[in-house]
């Protein structure tokens, strides 16, 4: 099956690998000690492209994108260009010294926050993300709620399963999250997005260490759902790394599967129209996006 790109909807900027966490499932291998970050020259070239080509959505991710010194510049350029801007936020970054301005800043610019919270129980979150992460995440969610997120501003949470299994039904999990977070912590949010763990980076290492690599790939293959193909995010998303190179998705970026035309292509080498119809690079990991109800950076593809 050859997948081809449709019209561009989402420009996803991965502005660096640095993060204040080092989660077991992270497909980016992000961590506090990573140094790969988008510099000012690249950020300005990206900004020029956004202004010229006006992508409908600018999705800023990492690592923890807020740790990049050019994060606010890119947010403001995206907003001024009329894009819907998304911040992929790990929540605990809001609790870091010097970053307590984030809730008010994001609210001021009406940025959508997509926040990762792999479970509504402290035990499971701390197991996957480290001790104290759940408590910091709850504190950050309360701060986001206090400035209007979850009511007048979009706050969506992301769920990743613990271990080598597919996510449960998205609507049921969303109802459970809303019940527990609302009842126990007074937290509100808009939607829950379920994302299937990709068999790459740290999660792949875990699978191999546990002897579950083949079993997980067999599960993904056996769960292939052809109805997910039309909505795959790689068809309408362009992934940009911290140096400006292009990929069909953030997962391909982490596997260094670059969009090429005899050489590496950078964002400033292309226009949205020149990308339409190009063949998408695929691998075994792509089965994670087509398994069961499907998976994308905005959750399940089928209900």
Question: Where do the PLM segments sit?
Answer:
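Generic structural signal for well-ordered alpha-helices
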Residues: 11, 47, 75, 103, ...
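C-terminal accessory regions of radical SAM enzymes
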Residues: 221-255
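Conserved alpha-helical substructure of the radical SAM core
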Residues: 1-62, 66-80
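Flexible mid-to-C-terminal extensions adjoining Fe-S/redox cofactors in radical SAM and related proteins
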Residues: 245-303
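Short Gly/Pro-enriched turn/cap motifs at secondary-structure boundaries
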Residues: 3, 226-229, 277-280
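Radical SAM enzyme [4Fe-4S]-AdoMet core and its adjacent flexible, acidic
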Residues: 114, 121-234
């Amino acid at each position: 099956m050859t997948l081809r790109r449709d019209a561009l909807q989402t420009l996803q900027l991965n502005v660096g690998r640095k993060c204040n966490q080092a989660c077991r499932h992270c497909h980016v291998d992000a961590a506090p000690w990573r140094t790969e970050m988008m510099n000012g020259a690249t950020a300005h070239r990206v900004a020029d492209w956004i202004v010229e080509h006006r992508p409908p959505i600018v999705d800023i991710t990492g690592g923890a994108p807020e740790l990049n010194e050019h994060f606010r510049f890119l947010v403001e350029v995206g907003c001024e260009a009329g894009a819907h801007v998304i911040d992929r936020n790990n929540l605990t970054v809001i609790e870091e010294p010097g970053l307590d301005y984030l809730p008010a800043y994001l609210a001021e610019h009406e940025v959508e926050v997509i926040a990762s919270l792999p479970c509504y129980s402290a035990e499971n979150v701390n197991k996957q993300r480290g001790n104290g992460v759940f408590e910091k995440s709850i504190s950050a969610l309360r701060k986001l709620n206090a400035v209007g997120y979850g009511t007048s501003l979009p706050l969506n949470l992301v769920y990743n399963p613990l271990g080598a299994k597919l996510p449960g039904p998205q609507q049921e999990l969303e109802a459970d999250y809303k019940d527990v977070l609302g009842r126990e912590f007074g937290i509100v949010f808009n939607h829950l997005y379920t994302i299937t763990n990709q068999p790459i980076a740290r999660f792949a290492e875990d699978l191999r260490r546990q002897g579950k690599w083949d079993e997980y790939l067999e599960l993904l293959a056996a769960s292939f759902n052809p109805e997910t193909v039309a909505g795959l995010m790689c068809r309408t998303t362009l992934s940009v790394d911290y140096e400006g190179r292009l990929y069909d998705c953030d997962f391909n970026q982490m596997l260094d599967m670059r969009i090429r035309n005899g050489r590496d292509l950078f964002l400033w080498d292309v226009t949205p129209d020149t990308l339409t119809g190009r063949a998408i690079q695929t691998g075994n990991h792509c089965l994670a996006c087509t398994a069961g109800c499907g998976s994308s950076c905005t959750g399940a593809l089928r209900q």
